[in-house]
């Protein structure tokens, strides 16, 4: 893979030894975990070649020929580009994070507005129409929605929308004067990625708000003569937000992992394009690093949601 089809056995064996692929799977797994943890142990009997690869570190001590070092997590080197995986992911992850944040923001704002309006108006026709649209939005695959959005708004209606089928956050100037920020390239990927969470947030807001408005405390607030806006927004909506926050947090975390197809269709330079390219070239360190990064983001988002719960619902606060 790295040496081509005409590589000799000696070169292949040398590469396997350099990458540690000649070790047992258990030893490779332990070595990978050792590279990830902040305090690591490295054998320096043959020199500091391993330490030189990991970048900055602080040597805490030495036990025999084993050095104890303090460092940032080391995700290895890419097989293809010979660059650090952390650098590759560091360049791509901000674009994915921005795309996911804009998508979930669109879904949150529009979903709350539409859900509140349909719950307040609450007519049979409007409920059926909302259910029909949200069902289509939830059942539409992301890759098909991306192709459809790119074809309609980036190709057929390009003269009216001014949007391109592909493009990233920064576009290279056609006269060679460098890169410039192009936020319009964010519109189609963000709308496409926000379709499914928008449908979920809309339906959850509507059903949760209808249930909350039938509670006794809402009837009491109305009986006291409070304005309808205050009753809905202060009393009913606040208690109806718990399932919405749960859905938004889950979707935001999944957008970080599930934006692969959308990014690939729109050529958005994020984690998705990096993962697809790594899969195509069997670049396993990049794949493992991307999976690990997404898993860490899932954990962090869930922790953040638990903290937000305490502000929304005092009943779940830890005393």
Please report, for each region that a protein language model flagged, where it lies by residue.
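Hydrophobic alpha-helical segments of integral membrane proteins
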Residues: 11, 15, 22-40, 85, ...
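Residue-level recognition of pore/gate-forming positions within transmembrane alpha-helices
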Residues: 6, 135, 151-152, 235, ...
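Membrane-water interface segments at the C-terminal ends of transmembrane alpha-helices
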Residues: 132-166, 192-198
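An internal, D/E-rich "acidic patch" concept
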Residues: 23-108
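Hydrophobic alpha-helical transmembrane segments of membrane transport/permease proteins
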Residues: 1-34, 45-54, 157-180
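Alpha-helical transmembrane segments of integral membrane proteins
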Residues: 93-98, 102-126, 142, 158, ...
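Short, hydrophobic secondary-structure boundary micro-motifs
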Residues: 1, 44-46, 76-78, 145-146, ...
């Amino acid at each position: 893979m790295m040496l081509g089809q005409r590589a000799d056995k000696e070169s292949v064996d040398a590469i396997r030894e350099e990458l540690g692929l000649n070790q047992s799977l258990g030893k490779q797994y332990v070595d990978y975990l050792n590279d990830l943890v902040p305090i690591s142990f490295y054998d320096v009997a043959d020199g500091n070649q391993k330490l030189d690869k990991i970048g900055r570190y602080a040597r805490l001590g030495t036990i025999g020929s084993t050095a104890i070092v303090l460092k940032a997590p080391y995700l290895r080197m890419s097989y293809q580009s010979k660059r650090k995986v952390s650098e590759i992911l560091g360049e791509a992850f901000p674009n994915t994070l921005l795309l996911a944040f804009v998508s979930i923001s669109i879904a949150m704002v529009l979903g709350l507005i539409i859900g509140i309006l349909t719950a307040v108006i609450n007519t049979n026709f409007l409920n059926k129409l909302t259910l029909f649209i949200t069902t289509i939005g939830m059942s539409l695959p992301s890759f098909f929605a991306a192709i459809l959005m790119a074809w309609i708004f980036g190709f057929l209606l390009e003269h009216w929308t001014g949007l391109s089928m592909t493009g990233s956050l920064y576009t290279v100037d056609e006269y060679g004067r460098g890169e410039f920020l192009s936020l319009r390239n964010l519109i189609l990927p963000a709308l496409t990625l926000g379709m499914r969470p928008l449908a979920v947030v809309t339906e959850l807001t509507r059903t949760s708000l209808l249930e909350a408005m039938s509670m006794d405390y809402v009837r009491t607030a109305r009986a006291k003569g409070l304005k309808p806006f205050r009753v809905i927004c202060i009393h009913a909506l606040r208690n109806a937000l718990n399932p919405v926050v749960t859905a938004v947090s889950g979707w935001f975390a999944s957008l970080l992992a599930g934006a692969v197809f959308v990014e690939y269709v729109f050529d958005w330079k994020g984690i998705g394009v990096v993962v697809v390219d790594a899969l195509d070239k069997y670049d396993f360190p990049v794949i493992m690093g991307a999976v690990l990064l997404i898993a860490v983001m899932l954990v962090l988002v869930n922790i953040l949601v638990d903290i937000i719960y305490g502000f929304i619902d005092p009943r779940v606060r830890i005393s």
